[in-house]
Amino acid sequence: MKMKKELDKELYPDYVYPEFTPDPNEPFREPIAKLGKKITDRIPQKLGLKKITRNDPEYWGLAGVLTDEEAELAVKLGVRKPKTLAEIVKLSGLEEKKCEALLEEMSRKGLLEYNWENPKHEKQYVLPMYVPGCAEFFNMNANILDSNPEMGTFFEHMSRLPLEKITPFVPEGGAGIGMHVIPVEKAIEMENESVDLEHISHWLNKYEGKYAASPCSCRRSRLTHGEGCADDPEGWCIAVGDMADYVVETQKDGRYIDKAEALEILKAAEDNGFVHQITNIDGANKIFAICNCNVNVCYALRTSQLFNTPNMSRSAYVAKVEKANCVACGKCVEFCPAGAVKLGQKLCDKEGCEVQYPRIPLPAEQPWGEHMWSHNYRDVNRINCYDTGTAPCKTACPAHVAVQGYLKLAKEGRYDDALALIKKDNPLPAVCGHVCNRRCEDACTRGTVDEAVAIDEVKRFLAERDLNAETRYIPKKTIPSLKGGFDEKIAIIGAGPAGLSCAYYLALTGYKPTIFEKNEEPGGMLRYGIPSYKLEKDLLAAEIDVIRELGVEIRCGVEIGKDITIEELREQGYKGFYVAIGCQRGRKPGITGENAKGTYAAVDFLREAGAKESFALEGDVVVVGGGNVAIDAARISSRCVDAKISMFCLEQRENMPASKEEIAEALEEGIELNCGWGPKEVLEEDGKVAGVVFKKCIRVLDEQGRFSPEYDEEQTVTIPCKHVIFSVGQAIEWGNMLDNLDLKRRSNGGALADKLTYQTSEPDIFVGGDVYTGPRFAIDAIAAGREGAISLHRYVHENCTLTIGRNRRDFVELDKNNISVESYDTSKRQIPAKADEKAQAATFRDLSHSLTEEQVKAETSRCLSCGASVVDPNKCIGCGVCTTKCVFDAIHLHREIPGASVMRASEDKLKYILPNMVKQSIKVKFAKKK
């Protein structure tokens, strides 16, 4: 079995590194070139085998910010050789006051650092290396970065170019290069063999009282070339010891913090899935920073991920999955920075063998070069599944809800935890528990044995807790900012499932979005298109209340384009828009008589009848269409008039778009179903409906599966009636919303947008739900809303990428034809108590029942627990982020690479790299011969 190697180039375009071209007319400055050579770690330039030119980052990265006088003084200091002011005065021959002024100015800019690490506790200045060192410091100085944005690209270059040839040969522990992953402390508390330097608490205690929160230089750097991740860069890096004073005193936007706040920052980082790293250039007794790193921007993590050389980052720990406990919820997968955890399966194949999963090769096993690099690592690491697939329920669900996970939690009676897990992927579980089309159940592996697990019924049972304010679950926000939230204003147009979902996920990310809804109540088609006997409005209102409690404002009775325009909202400071207005206008089939009095489009009929729970009907009703909307129209009609209700549709019964359950319920209520007929003409008398002529449909789809009906025009039937309700499609009602906007649309009126980001031709406008896809189900709109929120979060922060490092939410279903199910609970599928058919047919109230608690326990025991997470130990960097996301005690860190905790001084790196290179080369050579 192999992982996908060929990525969709449209979704995963080849990564292009940022470049900077210096002005060729600027005079070449030798002092700058000399200093660049002094500091660089690029071996050809260091040894003089290649001259430093104006096009080298070592040159242009310094030329824009330093004077020749500063460069001439700095080059005399030597790299990482601390000197006091007196020593530098003696060395340079400069007058003391002038010398100190130059040193302080270079410290302010970021070329120099300083500390008091000597017996006399005298201030001493240090010329650091580029990385970690002055490249970071330049990017931490906002004034420098504003005036010289090329410093962002300079940092990118100097954290990559010097490493290209040596990373395969770096031994465990990193040999004093760069940064070192330090695991989440809770993840290693039970490890008896752990050593002090593997614990963040050790370093916090060592530098007690000397901490400063400072900006992340990587996050700032990436913004300069359009690759920001939308995190607020401020405060994520904790300077310790004398470095705390340095970042506060030299305009690096640092601020002193106490230990309590340091711990809060670390916890916030873990909540966001950021990786703790410490500096690794001074041996085992010194660090100067604890960083909290997002793999989508971090150059330190890139050293292992780009070159596929985990020794550049990894801690002494490796994650392992307890398969028996794992339920393939996928949360560890979503957050793993290294892409080391992916979803697989527990079930054996037909031969009774466990699926064997591949491991990425290591440099010690084969020749290493650029062919083994992963330039697109930020995207590749977000691939969710092995090609052999995982749990079909999670795969089939458009929102990819962790079905297997919440079934297990419900089985254990952990109902709050189960609801919390659902709400990570679906903010409207109660709604879906009543109206979802249950693709998870269609895909359920248990269905190959007897009947699918009643997944939706379990979800309904759990979600009813939201109806009670005492048991309602309000999700915790996870905000990638230490300021408590974001001030950027975002407008959502439409309060249907897509708009509500988008608002929900934006709120969880720290925004306070505003929803504009033209109707009097929020909910969209959930409120105005679905009858109350299927979805009670108090249930919908309860879930909307949760969204309001998260800080979402919903303004009803406001039509965008009529009451206020998008341009006016822009003038009010709105930075991004999500248009989710649905397909709220019904279509008619284009036949004679379709506008006679007594004809209606189904969505218009449902809106009025559903709101009033009545409709003035007299005489027989014919409903044209075979989907769920048509059935809703027929069933509501039967509640509004004591007459014959007939349905006519093109499809044969087994091919009807409506669900089997909906069809069965309609038949139970006395609806007459006629399949294989299409409307030919509406008959009129005095402008009113008198009947409908239907013609025999002999084909619905063509050979390519496209809608292309054919008819036998000679075979017809005439149905007398007083009302005709057409459920033959829906259209988008834009109104005046798009006036003066250049928003491109399809020929059918739907919005054109990028298929990954949902961005339209108006860059600040994103779309989702039916307005983009055409009529689909609530769960499709919910899934789209989440993606819209991700795009808007990235968009409203300037210079952030909408695509890099984005989880494509692409899942693969395991092969149900190649599994063996050896033992399982043999109990039958649990069915909720059935409502009285006559009573249900006569009311708009929902008389259906949920499963009882006992039934839930029995039903959840039927799950075959198909999926599980799988860790590739060759990719794992031992950060422990996965352990913070698992609520099943299914993934833990184990100390298996003690050598990875051996920290070296940067000056000694070649002493450890060269012997390892020889040893490794010999090993690879003999391995090739075998």
What do the predicted segments below correspond to?
Residues 595-620, 682, 702-775:
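FAD-site-proximal beta/loop scaffold in flavoenzymes
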Residues 8, 338-392, 453-455, 459-489, ...:
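Flanking helices and flexible, charged tails adjoining ferredoxin-like Fe-S electron-transfer domains
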Residues 401-410, 452-456, 492-560, 587-590, ...:
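Beta1-alpha1 glycine-rich phosphate/pyrophosphate-binding loop at the start
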Residues 771-796:
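A conserved FAD-binding loop/helix module that cradles the flavin
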Residues 462-484, 542-562, 586-641, 745-761:
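Glycine-rich dinucleotide-binding loop and its adjacent helix/turn
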Residues 64, 94, 125, 277-290, ...:
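Ferredoxin-like iron-sulfur electron-transfer modules
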